[in-house]
Curated annotation (Swiss-Prot):
Keywords: Cytoplasm, Decarboxylase, Lyase, Porphyrin biosynthesis. It comes from Cereibacter sphaeroides (strain ATCC 17023 / DSM 158 / JCM 6121 / CCUG 31486 / LMG 2827 / NBRC 12203 / NCIMB 8253 / ATH 2.4.1.) (Rhodobacter sphaeroides). The lineage of its organism: Bacteria, Pseudomonadati, Pseudomonadota, Alphaproteobacteria, Rhodobacterales. The record marks D73 as: Transition state stabilizer. Pfam families: URO-D (PF01208). It is found in: Cytoplasm. This is Uroporphyrinogen decarboxylase.
Amino acid sequence: MTKTMLRALKGETLPTPPIWLMRQAGRYLPEYRATRAQAGDFLSLCYTPDLAAEVTLQPIRRYGFDAAILFADILLLPQALGADLWFETGEGPRMSTITDMAGVTALKGRDDIHETLAPVYETCRILARELPKETTFIGFAGMPWTVATYMIAGRGSKDQAAAHKLKDTDRPAFEALMDRVTEATIEYLAKQVEAGCEVVKLFDSWAGSLKGQDFEDFAVAPAKRIVSELKARFQGLPVIAFPREAGEGYIGFAEKTGADCVAIDNSVSPEWAAEKVQAGRTCVQGNLDPKYMVTGGEELVQATKRVVEAFRNGPHIFNLGHGITPEADPENVTLLVETIRGK
């Protein structure tokens, strides 16, 4: 097996870690901005397979990353379930809201999502054909808690208050929504794998707002269910889980859920994560602060070397602790890749 990304996910410690970046297809790249303008708007870009495949390929052509991640959005799934979704300029995503059991029961079933998502699967098929043979192809979905927070509040929020309120005041409706999203997520990811994805990543952007038993019930348990069902269908399928800002919750997350790799954010130090999470055996992905993609220079070189050094005694995939920002300088990404690969 020659793909370095897959070797790391199988638990191999490599002399040079594979590298890719969250949001590597994004607004920091002039070629992305040009293709997005051609699409007209963000959702049209997601749902036009040729253009979505093109923006997925752009950072691979430019930087030779070890992995490409499907260009899509975690909110395409709730849209496929029947939620209204639109993007406000400068404001981000907006959705119709679910506040009770009636809203949950009005959603489509898990087998009725594929008509809406068919263009995403076509994007996967194009990329499976066109990606370089050494590049690993990652599919993804949002985790149920994070997706549910948007479906309940109708927008992103700093504290996920609306979702916590529903969880605490109408537990049956909340749990029914989580179940619906979990089931649909499994079917969505299965179709991505059937269309050519080699790895799947689960993004739980708001996992950090779940504390104590809630973290176990609504971050760990859904991840475990998704991982086990996918691995039952696709033997040996590698899964990366990213319970962002989980802190101590990162410890043992891979073991509890069956994920092959845990992605970590930059609120924890690489040294702490190497000792507590990687522990010489668990694959860890991360965790350079995205700010260095803006500042660059010797600061970037030293911070990059620190991350590589911290994780060098176990399986490691180099990434940022969060998505690369629109302010990043493309030249700094070149410097990052050269630093890691010792060019």
